[in-house]
């Protein structure tokens, strides 16, 4: 048994851990969990925990449903609150999902990302990610379609001390840091009730695990503070939606491969081709980075979200932004992709972003001129004249772009690609057939 497994088993005994929760993520990004007693963990390390894969979204067909969850000891952390008896703690580990013969399950989101990271490694790169995660705090209420009510009336950077949960961010950050997740900073975002917590850089797989842990902890802390948290991309028509702006960089050993001292923006050829790859394939990957019908209510003109495939230095109206806070700090050279929302599957999102960027690097894509104007204010004719391709305006548009994409099919693997398309087509058709209050209000008198 290796040292990490021995450390986990020893910690369970020393901390008197009562339950071990084994986590994994389905294809749509929902967190799944099975709890085992500490005495069962050594066996789980050796043989895994079997479960019915046909009962998990996108995993397996009923006639080939035996699936195994194998805990990854490197992800072991003690949860930051006690069990219901008030005397014990629980711990959690993420799992890799395999078939009974030990081969990776093609439906495992972690495996999808691992394959892209292995490709980056073959090219000599390690991928690091830093997300800005936005979400809303709402007052308690039914989940029946009733319009939600924000927990406060604050705005951008406001010190909202009179809200319904004045200590929420402090409580959330304390919980995150107890789980080994480093927070860079936090603040109130632009809309009432909207919060942002930025996680410090980590390798892409660890960060995807961190994002799943983040969403779980934030919801639990919110409930404890008497409010509820929502990662819905656009819960309020009149306010900006919730993004997960994703900062990415590639390193070669300890060297930032995105940095070049000879460029005016200090961007290397690798960085420029990486950006060009994301711009070229932006429409194809949109259904993954923005996977819900509601996601496209956020990606609208004037919504503080990208609507065209453009890039720029410090330009927040562009799809890809090059942050210029510290222009002479080599280690911080990075690109920020502004389209993903905080309700995406982070494993699949990081995988397709990396696949698009690496395609640009491998093929030597040439980056066009940067956007120096406010892209939101340009007409469609002006955008076309400048070479800015419109991003999908609906989930239906995004699926049309995705279904013929060799890049996305290769990045996700045939199983996840086919299931994702089937599931999302069903979601889109269900939405298209739904008659909304807007239609009744405006058209019933016809």
Curated annotation (Swiss-Prot):
Regulation of catalytic or functional activity: Inhibited by glutamine.
Location of this chain's protein in the cell: Cytoplasm
Site (Important for inhibition by glutamine): residue numbering on this chain: 61
Assigned keywords, A-Z: ATP-binding, Cytoplasm, Isopeptide bond, Ligase, Magnesium, Metal-binding, Nucleotide-binding, Ubl conjugation
Co-factor binding comment: Binds 2 Mg(2+) ions per subunit.
Residue stretches making up the GS catalytic domain: 109-446
Pfam families found in the cross-reference section: Gln-synt_C, Gln-synt_N
GO aspect biological process, one term: glutamine biosynthetic process
Positions annotated to bind ATP: 184, 247-249, 316, 321
UniProt-listed PROSITE patterns: GLNA_ATP, GS_BETA_GRASP, GS_CATALYTIC
Protein residues bound to Mg(2+) 1: 132, 245, 336
Binding site for Mg(2+) 2: 134, 189, 196
GO CC term (a single one): cytoplasm
Family to which the UniProt record says this protein belongs: Belongs to the glutamine synthetase family.
Subunit structure of this chain's protein: Oligomer of 12 subunits arranged in the form of two hexagons. In its feedback-inhibited form, interacts with TnrA in order to block its DNA-binding activity.
The protein, known as: Glutamine synthetase
């Amino acid at each position: 048994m290796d040292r990490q497994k021995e450390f986990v088993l020893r910690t369970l005994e020393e901390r008197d851990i009562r339950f071990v929760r084994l986590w994994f993520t389905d294809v749509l990004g929902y967190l799944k969990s099975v709890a085992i007693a500490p005495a069962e963990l050594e066996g789980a390390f050796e043989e895994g925990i079997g479960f019915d894969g046909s009962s998990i979204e996108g995993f397996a067909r009923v006639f080939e449903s035996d699936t195994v969850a194998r805990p990854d000891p490197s992800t072991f952390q003690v949860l930051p609150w006690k069990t219901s008896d008030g005397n014990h703690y629980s711990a959690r580990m993420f799992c890799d999902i395999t078939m009974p013969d030990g081969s990776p399950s093609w439906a495992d989101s972690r495996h999808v990302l691992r394959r892209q990271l292995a490709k980056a490694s073959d090219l000599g790169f390690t991928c690091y990610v830093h997300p800005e995660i936005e979400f809303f705090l709402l007052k308690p209420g039914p989940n029946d379609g009733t319009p939600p009510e924000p927990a406060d009336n604050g705005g951008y950077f406001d010190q909202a001390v009179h809200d319904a949960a004045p200590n929420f961010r402090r409580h959330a950050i304390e919980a995150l840091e107890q789980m080994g997740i480093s927070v860079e900073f936090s603040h109130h975002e632009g809309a009432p009730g909207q919060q942002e917590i930025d996680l410090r850089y980590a390798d892409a797989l660890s960060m995807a695990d961190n994002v799943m842990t983040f969403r779980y902890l934030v919801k639990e802390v919110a409930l404890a503070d008497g409010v509820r948290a929502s990662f819905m991309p656009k819960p309020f028509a009149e306010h900006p939606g919730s993004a997960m702006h994703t900062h990415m960089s590639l390193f070669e050993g300890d060297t930032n491969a995105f940095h070049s001292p000879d460029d005016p923006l200090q961007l290397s050829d690798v960085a420029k081709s990486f950006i060009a790859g994301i711009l070229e394939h932006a429409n194809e990957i949109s259904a993954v980075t923005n996977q819900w019908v509601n996601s496209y209510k956020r990606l609208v003109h004037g919504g503080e979200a990208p609507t065209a495939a453009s890039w720029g230095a410090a330009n927040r109206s562009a799809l890809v932004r090059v942050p210029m806070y510290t222009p002479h700090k080599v280690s911080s050279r990075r690109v920020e992709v502004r389209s993903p929302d905080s309700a995406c599957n982070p494993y699949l999102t990081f995988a397709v972003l990396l696949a698009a960027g690496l395609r640009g690097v491998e093929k030597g894509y040439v980056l066009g001129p940067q956007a120096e104007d406010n892209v939101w204010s340009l007409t469609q004719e002006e955008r076309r004249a400048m070479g800015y391709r419109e991003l999908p305006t609906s989930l239906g548009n995004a699926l049309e772009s995705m279904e013929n994409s060799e890049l996305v099919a290769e990045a996700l693997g045939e199983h996840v690609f086919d299931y994702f398309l089937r599931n999302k087509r069903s979601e889109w058709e269900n939405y298209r057939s739904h008659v909304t209050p807007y239609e009744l209000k405006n058209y019933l008198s016809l």
